[in-house]
From Swiss-Prot:
Lineage summary: Bacteria, Bacillati, Bacillota, Bacilli, Bacillales
Catalytic residues (UniProt): 286
Binding sites annotated in the UniProt record for NAD(+): 154, 178, 181-182, 231, 386
Entry protein name: Malonate-semialdehyde dehydrogenase
Task performed by this protein: Catalyzes the oxidation of malonate semialdehyde (MSA) and methylmalonate semialdehyde (MMSA) into acetyl-CoA and propanoyl-CoA, respectively. Is involved in a myo-inositol catabolic pathway. Bicarbonate, and not CO2, is the end-product of the enzymatic reaction.
CDD domains registered for this protein in UniProt: ALDH_F6_MMSDH (cd07085)
Keyword Oxidoreductase: yes
SUPFAM superfamilies in the cross-refs: ALDH-like
Family listed: Belongs to the aldehyde dehydrogenase family. IolA subfamily.
Gene3D superfamilies linked to this entry: Aldehyde Dehydrogenase, Chain A, domain 1, Aldehyde Dehydrogenase, Chain A, domain 2
Record gene name: iolA
Length: 486
């Protein structure tokens, strides 16, 4: 339930809500108003150790629960998430700031991830080949790996945790979850509903906090694997530190997603697609379009329509259904984004839509409106860096080949999109672009949960992505059995 009461957030360890053993807390404001809605503990190492101990003890019995029985628990959890989806969306808007429309979409994508987890028995099946030699059979079996941990960001406080712990738990593991200290309330509700579904205590544990919790997870000898989503520098740190301590790690990192606009595109749908990708969720998502490479032949027409439509977007509290762009997560992030806008102007880019000029009626929240730059080049910071905001850079290119070359010069390679009605253009793009997830006339090429989610280059550290068969392989260990009976 959403109330006006300022909440003191707790950890959930071994089936119980408990106060952190530490004394340090951090205020959690509503990004749309700046008013404090909660205090979250910055838990110390001792809290992580207790959570791991609980998960380790629970693993001894949970890993032996028949696979169909584990799925039945997840079906109950899925039902509870569906029954409470309106409340969950409102919590997201309250603490994250994204519009209620965007939050509702996130809830649905999270539910779809749990739907995938319920099918884990099928995805976990091994392989067998009889009579590989005289009287000898061979087979591959998949087993859970033990205690695993997830470290998740503020921008998708429901979807990303649900990529992780339901599938890991369906595979027979137990879990320690550390969500962003900026969005702790949704995590609490996810855990409450999880235990309402009848899971045994200790199967899922929640430890709130900051970098001390992260370091404790990475260094704890009883945690076998770590899933992470966040910025590129932190992802690199998590991967290097976790693997140094002998852990299996998947670390999904930053992005600078490009869209190539061809002269043969459907102009109206392309403009609306770019707007949705660049400015929905205030641009705070790793699959947002942040650069458009538009072919010269259509550039002026495309830009004119894009600017006109963007100027219609309203900025404000996400609970107001008229608003399209909500606040950024924190005042510090807003100041960082304003710095990038100033940098773009100083570097000589043309500011076509200035998100700094927004209606004063938006109040005291952390607002930056949709922003568009033209005349951007690869030497500018606004092209190079992940800004994580509703800031779009336009680069004019002569043809598809130049657009592909531009895109591939980025150090990131998460997602990329082409807008075209030409199958040959789409095929050339697909085969030559360096990105983990590719869209053809698809605004945000984030795959459904039954496909793997992972980028390339500085957008991903590890071997196996989240979701789909990648996720099952990450959360399980293979045993190859060769057997003969006399």
């Amino acid at each position: 339930m959403i109330t006006t009461e300022i909440k003191r957030v707790k950890n959930h360890i071994n089936g119980e809500w408990v106060e952190s053993t530490g004394t340090e807390v951090e205020a959690v404001p509503n990004p749309a108003t700046g008013k404090i809605i909660a205090y979250v503990p910055l838990s110390p190492k001792e809290d992580v150790e207790k959570a791991v101990e609980a998960a380790k003890a629970a693993f001894e019995t949970w890993s032996k629960v028949p696979v169909p029985n584990r799925s039945r628990n997840l079906y109950k959890y899925l039902q509870l998430l569906q029954e409470n989806k309106d409340e969950l969306a409102k919590i997201i808007t309250l603490e994250n700031g994204k519009t209620l429309t965007d939050a509702t979409g996130e809830v649905q994508r999270g539910i779809e991830a749990v739907e995938l987890a319920t099918s884990a028995p099928n995805l976990m099946m091994g392989q067998a080949l009889p009579n590989i030699a005289s009287g000898i059979d061979g087979s591959i079996w998949r087993y859970p790996i033990g205690v695993v941990a997830g470290i998740t960001p503020f921008n998708f406080p429901m979807m990303i945790p649900l990529w992780m712990f339901p599938l890991a738990i369906a595979c027979g593991n137990t879990f320690v979850l550390k969500t962003s200290e900026r969005t702790p309330l949704l995590a609490e509700r996810l855990v409450e509903l999880f235990y309402e579904a009848g899971f045994p205590k200790g199967v899922l544990n929640l430890v709130q906090g900051g970098k001390d919790v992260v370091n404790s997870i990475l260094e704890n000898k009883d945690i076998q694997a770590v899933s992470f989503v966040g910025s590129e520098p932190v992802a690199r740190y998590v991967y290097e530190t976790g693997t140094k301590h002998g852990k299996r790690v998947q670390a999904l990192a930053g992005a600078k997603n490009h869209a190539i606009v061809m002269p043969d595109c459907n102009l109206e749908k392309t403009v609306q697609g770019v707007i949705g990708s660049a400015f929905a969720s205030s641009g705070e998502r790793c699959m947002a379009c942040s650069v458009v490479a538009v072919v010269d032949e259509i550039a002026d027409e495309f830009i004119d329509v894009l600017v006109a439509e963007t100027k219609k977007l309203k900025v404000g509290d996400g609970f107001n259904e008229d608003n399209y762009v909500g606040p950024l997560i924190r005042e510090s992030h807003k100041e960082r984004v304003l710095g990038y806008i100033s940098s773009g102007v100083a570097d000589g880019a043309t500011l076509l839509v200035d998100g700094r000029k927004i209606n004063e009626e938006v109040g005291e929240g952390y607002f930056v409106g949709a922003t568009i730059f033209d005349g951007v080049n690869q030497e500018m910071k606004i092209w190079q860096d992940e800004i994580f905001a509703p800031v779009l850079s336009i680069v004019r290119v002569k043809d598809l080949e130049e657009g592909i070359k531009l895109t591939n010069q980025s150090k990131f390679a998460n997602g990329a999109v082409i807008y075209t009605s030409n199958g040959k253009h789409a095929q050339t793009f697909r085969d030559n672009i360096d990105a983990g997830m590719i869209g053809v006339n698809v605004n945000v090429p984030a795959p459904m949960a039954f496909f793997a989610f992972a980028g390339n280059k500085a957008s991903f550290f590890g071997d196996l992505g989240t979701n789909g068969t990648d996720g099952v392989q990450f959360y399980t260990r293979k045993k190859v059995v060769t057997e003969r009976w006399f």
